[in-house]
């Protein structure tokens, strides 16, 4: 009987090897330090106009999201200073780009600012908080005094952080592109590289998208920085112009990059591609 009961008893489970303790999650890698230019003469803020004129046909499309500090009432009345159709087109075409954003624009459109800042296709750079001129006589813009210039730039960065832009770049575009020695000296402590351009898109207040596209296509050379705008009310033709420009430049063998990559090339070092950004071939 004892033998029969032993035969009917369920087999003992085999001893299990001890499970390894779960590994701690790896710490996120620190963001790479964006390339900048060395200070200019007398330690002034350096100014970048274009990348190397080499056989590597690269071009950077840049877009100014330039709502001015005193335009809040116009936005409240329905004027649109954003351009979601343009951003959607850049995403659909897989075009990396640099957006020079004012702090006031980011305040008005925080969700869009955050979306741009978190999309690896784009990089967000500084276009001041107020979009007031840093010199006199600059396209009729109000002016910011020399003793407030640095604060205006730093206020924009503070807004970017507040709305959730994780990694705004240390690049600054002067409102209207207007600057002088006083402005360069005032911004030296901010540690930014001023970014100008060598190709004017001419989209501000333009009504002919084909004319804007022709102006860009006629001006682009290897290493070019193209200035356009990300504002529906002031630049309504930009999206259509971009849809014309992008395939044509690719047909000519150009590769679209962000400004950081051109600055890295100017410094003689390659900027590694960021995760999630497709390699774009012409």
PLM regions: where:
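Extracytoplasmic/secreted proteins, especially bacterial periplasmic and envelope-associated proteins
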Residues: 58, 81-85, 108-111, 148-151, ...
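N-terminal pre-catalytic segment of deacetylase/amide-hydrolase enzymes
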Residues: 1-84, 113, 244-245, 252-282
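Sec-exported extracytoplasmic/periplasmic mature domains
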Residues: 91-95, 117-118, 154, 158-165, ...
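Active-site beta->alpha N-cap acidic-glycine motif
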Residues: 33-126, 130-142, 155-168
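Structural recognition of the beta-strand scaffold that forms the well-ordered cores
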Residues: 59-62, 97-101, 123-126, 170-174, ...
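Acidic-and-aromatic substrate-binding clefts and catalytic sites of carbohydrate-active enzymes
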Residues: 69, 77-78, 101-110, 173-180, ...
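Accessory recognition modules or surfaces
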Residues: 117-123, 151, 207-209, 213-229, ...
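His/Asp/Glu-enriched short active-site or ligand-binding loop at hydrolase and phosphoryl-transfer sites
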Residues: 179, 183-220, 254-265
